[in-house]
C-alpha cells in the first residue's frame, strides 16, 4: 500500500491545486492554468501560494502551531508534508482517537490517526481566509483610498494614536513644572521642592523621548507598508491597462505620472502626518488654556480663522501653479525619453543644437513654474509667521494686564504662553507643510489618471479552454479613435484549425489591425471575434494570449540572457526545449557564436545584435510554449535573405499542428500558405490560393508583378 507521504508527494504541483480547492471552498473563482501562468511555471512553494492567494481574493498566513494546538486552528487550511508537497487539512474529528480529515489533490478525503498525521505533517500550516471584496480594487483612487488601508493596519494606527495622546499629556507637564517653579519655588526659596520637580521633569523628558522614538518607528513601519501596497498596486494596474491607453499617451507622460509616487511616499514617511496628529490633539491644550484664562484663550483662537482665511485664498492659486509645474515637468520627461530613445536619429541628422534649444526652452519653463510655486508658498509662510507674531504680542499684552490686575500669576502667564505654543506651533508647521500637502494632492490626482482607468483584466470573465485553433471574424469593424476612419470595415473571415493563412496588402490596409483584434489588444466597435466559437470580448484576455504565439515586426528583447529571453513565456523550460525553439527559428548557429552562448547577457533591447538576429530570437520566443495559434506580423521583414531562407525552410515544421497567420509585404513569405487574404482599405479585397489569385489578375497579381519587377 502506498504511504500517505508518497501519495501526496506524487501529486504534481500540489500547492497550486490545494489553493484552487480552498478558493472554490470559499466561493472564489480560481483557474490553475491562469495562476501558473502569472506566478510560476514550476511547482508552487509557500511564498508563491501566498502571492497567488491575493490574486483570487484569499488571505494566506504561514503558521507553525504546536501539534496540541492544531484542533484550535481555523480550518480548512493548507498543510506542508515532509516531502515538500501540500495537502488540505479539513478538520479534526472528535473522539478518543483524534482522527484527522485530510484531502490530497485529485483524491478522495482520507481519515488519518493522530500519529499517522504527525508522521505526514512537516509542521507548517497556511491559514486561509477571504480577503476584502474584489470590488474594492475598482474604487476610485483619491485620499479615500487610504481609508481601507488604514483600517487594515488599524492596530498599528491605534498604537500611534495612543502614543500621540500620551505625548500630549506629557507635554502638559512642562508648563505646570515652570508654573510651580516660578510661583512656589522662587517665591518661597523651596529648594527641596525644586529637586523633586527636577527629578520628575527629567523622568518626563526621558519617557517622552522613548515614546517619541516608538511612535516614529511604528509610523515609519506603517507608512512603509502603505508605500509597498501602493507601489505594487500601481505597477500591477499599469500592466493590466489596455494597449489603447499607452498608444494614446507619450511614454514620458506615463513615466512622469508614475514618478509622482515619490511625492506621496515622501509625504507618508515624512513628518507631515505627525504634524496633522499634533494639530488634532491640540484640542487638549485648548481645553487646559480655557482653565487658565478664557480671555487669553480667545486671543489665541482668534488667529485660527485668519489661518483658515489665508489658506482659503492661497490654496486655489497654489493648486493651479502646481498643475502647471507638473505639466511642464511631464513635458520635460517626455522630451527626454523621446531624445534618449531616438538618439541615433538625432545624431545621424545632426540636429543636436535644435534639440538643445528645445530642452533649454522647456527647462526654463519648468524652472519658472517651480519659482511661481515657491513664491506662493513663501507668501503663505510669511502670512502665517506674521499672524503668529501678532498672537504672541496679543497674549503678552493681555496677559500682562491680567497679571497687573492680579487675576493671574506670573507662573500662570508663562505656563499659558507655553501651552499656546503647543497650539500655534503645529498650525505653523502645518502651514509650512501646506505646499507638500498640495503637491501630494496633485500627485494623487495624477496617479489617479492611471489607477482610475479600467483595466482589460477582469476577474469575472470566463477562462478560455485549450485552443484548437479555429478563428472567425463576423462582420468586424474597428477604428482607433472616434474621429478617425474605419481601420477595418465589415470584415468577415473564417480560419480552420491548422490552416496557414497569409495576409497581404498595401501599408495601412488593416493587416496588423486584424491580428491585434484577434489578440484582443483592441475590442471591435462592431461585430464579433470568435476563437473556437468563444467570443473573445467576454473571456479573460490573459487566458487567450498565453495560448497565442506572436512575432511583431520588431521584437523587443530585454536585459537578460539569451536563454531567458527565449524562455520568457516558459521560465521553467529545459535547455533542450530552448535549443529546439532556437533551431526552428534559425537562431541556434549565431547564438553558439556569442561569447557565452545561450548565457550571454543582452543589452537593453538586444543592443549588439543585428535586426535579423533579434528577430530570430523573437521567433524562437514565440515557439517555445508551443502555441496553438501563431501570428507572424512582418516577422521576416528584418531578415536577410539567408536567414529568411532558413525560416522558410523550417516553415513546415513551424506550422505543423497549429493555425498560422502570416502578415507580409514580401509575397514570397506567404506563397506556402493554404490561403491568402488580400486587404485593401480595411476590407477583404481578395481571398484564395497563390495560383488562384494570380489567375484572377486583381490586386494580388499587380503586387506580385511589382515585386517581380523590383527583383528583376
Swiss-Prot record:
GO terms for cellular component: plasma membrane; type I protein secretion system complex. Disulfide bonds: none annotated. The keyword Transmembrane applies. Residues 471-706 form the ABC transporter domain. Its EC number is 3.4.22.-, 7.6.2.-. ATP binds at residues 505-512. InterPro entries: AAA+_ATPase, ABC1_TM_dom, ABC1_TM_sf, ABC_transporter-like_ATP-bd, ABC_transporter-like_CS, ATPase_T1SS_HlyB, P-loop_NTPase, Peptidase_C39. Involved in the export of calmodulin-sensitive adenylate cyclase-hemolysin (cyclolysin). This is Cyclolysin secretion/processing ATP-binding protein CyaB. It comes from Bordetella pertussis (strain Tohama I / ATCC BAA-589 / NCTC 13251). The lineage of its organism: Bacteria, Pseudomonadati, Pseudomonadota, Betaproteobacteria, Burkholderiales.
Amino acid at each position: 500500500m502506498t504511504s500517505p507521504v508518497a501519495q501526496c508527494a506524487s501529486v504534481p504541483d500540489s500547492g497550486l491545486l490545494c489553493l484552487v480547492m480552498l478558493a472554490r471552498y470559499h466561493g472564489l473563482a480560481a483557474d490553475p492554468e491562469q495562476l501558473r501562468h502569472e506566478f510560476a511555471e514550476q511547482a508552487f512553494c509557500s511564498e508563491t501560494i501566498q502571492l497567488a492567494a491575493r490574486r483570487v481574493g484569499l488571505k494566506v498566513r504561514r503558521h507553525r502551531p504546536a501539534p496540541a494546538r492544531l484542533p484550535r486552528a481555523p480550518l480548512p487550511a493548507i498543510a506542508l508534508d515532509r516531502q515538500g508537497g501540500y495537502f488540505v487539512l479539513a478538520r479534526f474529528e472528535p473522539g478518543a482517537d483524534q482522527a484527522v480529515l485530510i484531502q490530497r489533490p485529485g483524491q478522495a478525503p482520507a481519515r488519518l490517526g493522530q500519529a499517522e498525521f504527525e508522521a505526514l505533517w512537516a509542521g507548517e500550516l497556511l491559514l486561509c481566509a477571504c480577503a476584502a471584496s474584489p470590488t474594492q480594487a475598482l474604487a476610485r483612487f483619491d485620499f479615500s483610498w487610504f481609508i481601507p488601508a488604514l483600517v487594515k493596519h488599524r492596530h498599528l494606527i491605534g498604537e500611534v494614536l495612543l502614543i500621540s495622546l500620551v505625548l500630549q499629556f506629557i507635554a502638559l507637564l512642562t508648563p505646570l513644572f515652570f508654573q510651580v517653579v516660578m510661583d512656589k519655588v522662587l517665591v518661597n526659596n523651596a529648594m527641596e521642592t525644586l529637586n523633586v520637580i527636577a527629578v520628575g521633569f527629567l523622568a518626563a523628558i526621558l519617557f517622552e523621548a522613548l515614546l517619541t522614538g516608538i511612535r516614529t518607528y511604528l509610523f515609519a513601519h506603517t507608512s512603509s507598508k502603505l508605500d509597498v501596497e501602493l507601489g505594487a498596486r500601481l505597477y500591477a494596474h499599469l500592466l493590466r491597462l489596455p494597449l489603447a491607453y499607452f498608444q494614446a499617451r507619450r511614454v514620458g507622460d506615463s513615466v512622469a505620472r508614475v514618478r509622482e509616487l515619490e511625492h506621496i511616499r515622501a509625504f507618508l514617511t515624512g513628518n507631515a502626518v505627525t504634524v496633522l496628529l499634533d494639530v488634532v490633539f491640540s484640542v487638549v491644550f485648548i481645553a487646559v488654556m480655557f482653565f487658565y484664562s478664557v480671555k487669553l484663550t480667545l486671543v489665541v483662537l482668534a488667529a485660527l480663522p485668519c489661518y483658515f482665511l489665508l489658506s482659503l485664498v492661497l490654496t486655489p492659486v497654489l493648486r493651479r501653479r502646481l498643475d502647471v509645474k507638473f505639466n511642464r515637468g511631464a513635458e520635460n520627461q517626455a522630451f527626454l525619453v523621446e531624445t534618449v530613445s531616438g538618439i541615433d536619429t538625432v545624431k545621424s541628422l545632426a540636429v543636436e543644437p535644435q534639440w538643445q534649444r528645445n530642452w533649454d526652452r522647456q527647462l526654463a519653463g519648468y524652472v519658472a513654474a517651480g519659482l511661481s510655486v515657491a513664491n506662493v508658498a513663501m507668501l503663505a509662510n510669511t502670512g502665517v509667521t506674521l499672524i503668529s507674531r501678532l498672537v504672541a504680542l496679543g497674549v503678552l499684552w493681555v496677559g500682562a494686564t491680567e497679571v497687573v490686575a492680579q487675576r493671574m500669576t506670573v507662573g500662570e502667564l508663562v505656563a499659558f504662553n507655553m501651552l499656546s505654543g503647543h497650539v500655534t506651533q503645529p498650525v505653523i508647521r502645518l502651514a509650512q507643510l501646506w505646499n507638500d500637502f498640495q503637491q501630494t494632492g496633485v500627485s494623487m490626482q495624477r496617479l489617479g489618471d492611471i489607477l482610475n482607468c479600467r483595466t482589460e483584466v477582469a476577474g469575472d470573465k470566463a477562462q478560455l479552454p485549450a485552443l484548437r485553433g479555429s478563428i472567425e471574424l463576423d462582420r468586424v469593424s474597428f477604428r482607433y479613435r472616434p474621429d478617425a476612419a474605419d481601420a477595418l470595415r465589415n470584415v468577415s473571415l473564417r480560419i480552420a484549425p491548422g490552416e496557414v493563412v497569409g495576409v497581404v496588402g498595401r501599408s495601412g490596409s488593416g493587416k496588423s489591425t486584424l491580428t491585434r483584434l484577434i489578440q484582443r489588444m483592441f475590442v471591435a466597435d462592431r461585430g464579433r471575434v470568435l476563437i473556437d466559437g468563444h467570443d473573445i470580448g467576454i473571456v479573460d484576455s490573459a487566458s487567450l494570449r498565453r495560448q497565442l504565439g506572436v512575432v511583431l515586426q520588431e521584437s523587443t528583447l530585454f536585459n537578460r540572457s539569451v536563454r531567458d529571453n527565449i524562455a520568457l513565456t516558459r521560465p521553467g523550460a529545459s535547455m533542450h526545449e530552448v535549443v529546439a525553439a532556437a533551431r526552428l527559428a534559425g537562431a541556434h548557429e549565431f547564438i553558439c557564436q556569442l561569447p557565452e552562448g545561450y548565457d550571454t547577457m543582452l543589452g537593453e533591447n538586444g543592443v549588439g545584435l543585428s535586426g535579423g538576429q533579434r528577430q530570430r530570437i523573437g521567433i524562437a520566443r514565440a515557439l517555445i510554449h508551443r502555441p496553438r495559434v501563431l501570428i507572424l506580423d512582418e516577422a521576416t521583414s528584418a531578415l536577410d535573405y539567408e536567414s529568411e531562407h532558413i525560416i522558410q525552410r523550417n516553415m513546415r515544421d513551424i506550422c505543423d499542428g497549429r493555425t498560422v497567420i502570416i502578415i507580409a509585404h514580401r509575397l514570397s513569405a506567404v506563397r506556402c500558405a493554404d490561403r491568402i487574404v488580400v486587404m485593401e482599405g480595411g476590407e477583404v479585397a481578395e481571398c484564395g490560393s497563390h495560383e488562384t489569385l494570380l489567375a484572377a489578375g486583381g490586386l494580388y497579381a499587380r503586387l506580385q508583378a511589382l515585386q517581380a519587377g523590383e527583383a528583376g
